[in-house]
């Protein structure tokens, strides 16, 4: 913390079927600052990006995230692409991207700078080499086990 100024970190994602990879991502993001705010993807955004609706609605995903000790606040994003206005409103010092998020750090930083925000954009690494911490792999395993 620089003086009395709190460092605000913002992350975003779907966070559907929460797993250990999400927890480690949130923990690493929290370690970058004093306050962690999570933007949960809107249901329509999930459907558009993944080609299917989320398993759990945004309100439920947000409630689960609020229960995690690393998370200080949760907001549900707007439908569509990342909302620069929402990010501007949240006033982050740092935006932490997950290892599998398809945002380019430099491009995102330039977009933020174009609306007057100087934000550090960091890509966090995978903690696991295998696929056990990926929602799509978990869904596949569930269907293999329970849907003969």
Curated annotation (Swiss-Prot):
Which pathway does the record list? Answer: Cofactor biosynthesis; FAD biosynthesis; FAD from FMN: step 1/1
For whether the record's keyword set contains Repeat, the answer is no
Annotated GO molecular function terms are: ATP binding; FMN adenylyltransferase activity
Keywords from UniProt, A to Z, are: ATP-binding, FAD, Flavoprotein, FMN, Nucleotide-binding, Nucleotidyltransferase, Transferase
Q: Does the keyword Transferase apply?
A: yes
Q: Which family does it belong to?
A: Belongs to the archaeal FAD synthase family.
Subunit record text: Homodimer.
What is the official name of this protein in its record? FAD synthase
Origin organism of this chain? Pyrococcus abyssi (strain GE5 / Orsay)
Q: Which gene encodes it?
A: ribL
């Amino acid at each position: 913390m620089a003086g009395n100024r709190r460092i605000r970190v913002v992350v975003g994602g779907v966070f559907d079927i929460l797993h250990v990879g999400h927890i480690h991502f949130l923990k690493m993001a929290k370690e970058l600052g004093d306050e962690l705010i999570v933007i949960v993807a809107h249901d329509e955004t999930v459907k558009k990006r993944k080609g299917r609706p989320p398993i759990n609605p945004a309100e439920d995903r947000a409630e689960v995230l609020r229960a995690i000790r690393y998370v200080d606040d949760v907001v549900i994003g707007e439908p569509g692409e990342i909302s620069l206005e929402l990010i501007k409103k949240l006033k982050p010092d740092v935006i932490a991207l997950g290892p599998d998020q398809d945002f380019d750090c430099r491009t995102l930083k330039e977009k933020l700078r174009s609306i007057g925000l100087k934000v550090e954009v960091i890509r966090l690494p995978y903690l696991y080499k295998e696929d056990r911490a990926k929602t799509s792999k978990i869904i596949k395993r569930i269907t293999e086990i329970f849907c003969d």
